[in-house]
């Protein structure tokens, strides 16, 4: 029975690898703005919302670019 699971894992592994790459690319493409939007919606106080709107998205964009550079090679 163990060999069946190993064989199934070998067949499924390339699909998971492709799906993981697609998820990573989508997250890097739309992630910073989406995460910043979620953070802004979850904060109730208006001054803090404005501060997050100005500061959070550029920081997340820089982090996403650094992550993309690491996996670009």
Curated annotation (Swiss-Prot):
Keywords: Cell inner membrane, Cell membrane, Cytoplasm, Membrane, Stress response
Compartments where found: Cytoplasm; Cell inner membrane
Pfam families according to UniProt: Phageshock_PspD
Bilayer topology: Peripheral membrane protein
Keyword Cell inner membrane: yes
Predominant subcellular localization, coarse grouping: cytoplasm
Role: The phage shock protein (psp) operon (pspABCDE) may play a significant role in the competition for survival under nutrient- or energy-limited conditions.
Similarity remark: Belongs to the PspD family.
Full protein name: Phage shock protein D
């Amino acid at each position: 029975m163990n060999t069946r699971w190993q064989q199934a894992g070998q067949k499924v592994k390339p699909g998971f690898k492709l799906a993981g790459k697609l998820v990573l690319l989508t997250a890097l493409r739309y992630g910073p703005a989406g995460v910043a939007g979620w953070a802004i919606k979850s904060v109730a106080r208006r001054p803090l919302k404005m501060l997050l709107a100005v500061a959070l998205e550029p920081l997340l964009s820089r982090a996403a670019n650094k992550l993309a550079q690491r996996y670009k090679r």
